[in-house]
């Protein structure tokens, strides 16, 4: 998905290299036509979000890419890969913005699940940056964080309300990694499997 999003950024003025990348994506899709998302029956209706960011990944404007995904039970139900609207000055800021995007989706899904009489609180949001996690717990502005736009601090508000609970996860187990950058083949296949994208026929 990340490669599709990168190619989409150049729709207005594509180059030969973009066509080569799109052909490679189409070749991958043709080779994995028998793959799909696996939704096993009988899983508990628990929700968990994963957020990650590729700090300054865009070579043109140095904006970071946010990647998020959400599992209901053990099944992938929501994902997104998007370039951030502003330039982050640190990895912490980029990860904090990505976690905010993840939190917004968690809140929407929480409301949808309440329509089915499923009530969830303290929904875990997994992040692999301890500084970003600490920023959600500390309301005091420091010189290194005071420039962060107010709209990104709604994450802290919802953590304090108990809607979601941001937790540390080791980078090796960070499922959202696949939505932020190109990965080595073995790592890509590992995350694809962990997300429940399997050969189904």
What are these regions (language model features)?
Residues 1-36, 170, 178-180:
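C-terminal reverse transcriptase regions that engage the nucleic-acid substrate
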Residues 1-2, 32-37, 57, 118, ...:
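Short helix-interrupting loop/turn segments at helix-coil junctions
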Residues 3, 40, 50-51, 71-73, ...:
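Generic beta-strand/beta-sheet core signal
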Residues 14-18, 42-43, 62-63, 90-95:
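Secondary-structure capping and boundary motifs in well-ordered enzyme cores
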Residues 18, 28-30, 63, 102-105, ...:
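Active-site-proximal structural scaffolding
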Residues 27-51, 118:
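Structured nucleic-acid-interacting core domains from mobile-element enzymes and related host factors
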Residues 46, 76, 82-201:
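RNase H-like nuclease module associated with reverse transcription
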Residues 50-92:
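RNase H-like nuclease fold core
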């Amino acid at each position: 998905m990340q490669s599709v999003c990168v190619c989409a950024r150049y729709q207005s003025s594509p180059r030969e290299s973009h066509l080569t990348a799109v052909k490679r994506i189409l070749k991958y899709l043709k080779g994995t036509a028998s793959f799909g998302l696996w939704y096993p029956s009988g899983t508990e209706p628990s929700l968990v979000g994963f957020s990650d960011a590729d700090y300054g990944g865009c070579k043109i404007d140095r904006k970071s890419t946010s990647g998020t995904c959400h599992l209901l039970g053990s099944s992938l139900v929501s994902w997104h890969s998007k370039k951030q609207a502003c330039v982050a000055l640190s990895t912490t800021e980029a990860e904090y913005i990505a976690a905010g995007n993840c939190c917004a989706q968690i809140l929407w899904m929480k409301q949808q699940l309440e329509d089915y009489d499923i009530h969830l609180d303290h929904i875990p949001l997994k992040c692999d940056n301890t500084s970003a996690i600490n920023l959600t717990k500390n309301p005091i502005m420091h010189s290194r964080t005071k420039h962060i736009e107010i709209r990104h601090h709604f994450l802290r508000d919802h953590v304090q309300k108990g809607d979601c609970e941001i937790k540390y996860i080791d980078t090796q187990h960070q499922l959202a990694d696949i939505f932020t950058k190109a990965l080595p083949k073995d790592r890509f296949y590992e995350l694809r499997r962990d997300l429940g994208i399997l050969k189904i026929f």
